[in-house]
Design a protein with these regions (language model features):
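A glycine-rich (often HGG/GG-containing) alpha/beta subdomain
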Residues: 1-146, 150, 154, 328-331
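C-terminal-of-GTPase-core extension/linker across diverse P-loop GTPases
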Residues: 2-15, 144-264, 281-283, 312-455
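Switch I (G2) and immediately adjacent beta-strands of P-loop GTPase domains
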Residues: 53-65, 69-73, 253-281, 299-302
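Structural motif
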Residues: 89, 307-310, 336-337
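Short glycine-/small-residue-rich Rossmann-like dinucleotide-binding loops
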Residues: 241, 276-277, 301, 308, ...
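Generic enzyme active-site microenvironment
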Residues: 272, 306, 333
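Short alpha-helix of the ABC ATPase nucleotide-binding domain corresponding to the H-loop/switch region
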Residues: 278, 286-290, 318
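Inter-motif core of Ras-like GTPase G domains
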Residues: 286-310
């Protein structure tokens, strides 16, 4: 990486502060062309990691802003290269003019995620940490941000490194046995190796098991609202969103198709799916809507079963209950608590663990519903940030787990060292893909292309 890159690192609309970022061997030379410090010293003589007041110049040397400049000499920088930032007033024209001046001084426009890619290639971050940068930028909830920053801090990386180092040490012993056939694995060594494989298998099983939670954390919990027509599903959707998203009328069967929206409830990101009321005998369009409701329930992790508290249970309610019972997590919301109660809530409490009263019309009980949702997906289960959050990570972890299980089984039944070694090598290769020690260049390019320009 012999060139120097530059980019605007802040959003492209007027704001209080805008930042120009650059990284590469010619950082100081580029700064001297566009920045004139008030203390008169060139960039290379400025104190590292200290803000310096000065003027930002355009390509002709005209002053365009009063700015602060901070320099991060290699290797103690984000990318591991010489880096700098120019903190300007957040005017798009100032930032664009400053960026053009940096290009005129020899910098190149940074590609998407190129600063983070350079950090990875220079060993400042491993691939898991680099991926967490994009997760942190895209975080919509405190849970998402917490998990991303834990991974950026190395929580997941340390878990993978511990597994990798244990397997590498064991593989080294097997190499010695394979290279020198007269050597043999003593019983004590065999037990130690089996223990290493057992711990590796347990750690990998925990990572793989956490993937489903990691995906829910990242993408949002698919949450389906189920109930008979006119139970108040759309009203509850609107109440949770805080605005009118779905059409609400007194006419049963108003909702014909699924309506989807994202909302953070109790710190949990939900992908709310309002569905057509569950009943038989509707027209062709309504029947199609009911089928889509059933399909949505199959994909959901949480069901909010909405019952009309002003009426007794009907066959249509029981049909909705049967469908809701197929979803892993279930909360029963007895709606219309502002009206006279006809539904036997005590009988419902005998059938379900989570039954609560709400009024979508007045907002009564929504706080209790929010708490119930948060209790289903508590932040405390985040395992300190050691959560796989994308399919690439899960695939590599699954392959590593399979190889470790094969190695453990082969060693237990006394297979020859070369067989066990082959499985260990497969596990190490998969773990190398997971943390970036062994990864294809095209995959690296794809991963970093998803990160925003300037990061």
């Amino acid at each position: 990486m012999s060139d120097t890159i530059a980019a605007i690192a802040t959003p492209g609309q007027p704001s209080a502060i805008g930042i120009l970022r650059l990284s590469g061997p010619d950082t100081c030379a580029a700064l001297d062309a566009v920045f004139r410090a008030k203390n008169g010293r060139p960039a290379a003589q400025q104190r590292p990691r200290a803000m310096v007041l000065g003027e930002l110049l355009d390509e002709t040397g005209q002053v365009i802003d009063s700015v602060l400049c901070v320099r991060f000499p290699a290797p103690h920088s984000y990318t591991g290269e010489d880096c700098a930032e120019l903190h300007c007033h957040g005017s798009p024209i100032v930032l664009d003019t400053g960026l053009r001046a940096l290009f005129a001084a020899g910098c190149r426009q940074a590609g998407p995620g190129e600063f983070t890619k350079r950090a990875f290639l220079n060993g400042q971050l491993d691939l898991l940490q680099a991926e967490s940068v994009a997760d942190l930028i895209d975080a919509e909830t405190a849970q998402q941000a917490h998990n991303a920053v834990c991974q950026l801090d190395g929580a997941l990386s340390r878990t993978v490194a511990r597994i990798y180092d244990g397997l590498m040490d064991m593989a080294a012993r097997f190499y010695a046995v394979v290279d020198y056939p007269d050597e043999d694995i003593e019983d004590l060594q065999r037990e130690q190796m089996l223990d290493t494989l057992r711990r590796a298998q347990n750690d990998l099983e925990a990572l793989v098991a956490g993937f489903s939670r990691g995906r829910l954390l990242k993408l949002g919990v698919p949450t389906v609202l189920l109930g008979k027509p006119n139970a108040g599903k759309s009203s509850l959707l609107n109440a949770l969103l805080g605005y009118d998203r779905a059409i609400v009328t007194d006419i049963a069967g108003t909702t014909r198709d699924t309506v989807e929206e994202k909302v953070t409830v109790g710190g949990v990101l939900l992908r709310l799916i309002d569905t057509a009321g569950i009943r038989d005998g509707g027209d062709a369009v309504e029947t199609m809507g009911v089928e889509r409701s059933r399909a949505a329930a199959k994909q959901a992790s949480l069901a909010l079963l909405v019952l009309d508290g002003s009426r007794e249970l009907t066959a249509e309610d029981e049909a909705a209950i049967a469908l809701a019972n197929t979803v892993p997590h279930l909360i029963v919301a007895v709606n219309k608590s502002d009206l006279p109660r006809a539904l036997d809530v005590g009988a419902l409490a005998d059938r379900f663990d989570n039954v609560l009263s709400v009024s979508a019309a007045t907002g009564a009980g929504l706080d209790t519903l929010t708490d119930a949702i948060a209790a289903q997906f508590p932040a405390g289960e985040s395992t300190g940030g050691a959560l796989l959050t994308n399919a690439r990570q899960a695939d590599a972890a699954n392959r590593a787990l399979s190889a470790v299980a094969e190695a453990r089984g082969a060693l237990r039944i006394g297979m020859t060292p070369d067989v066990v070694l082959t499985d260990c090598e497969a596990a190490l290769a998969a773990l190398g893909e997971l943390n970036g020690k062994q990864v294809r260049d095209d995959l690296v390019d794809t991963i970093f292309s998803r990160v925003c320009v300037g990061k």
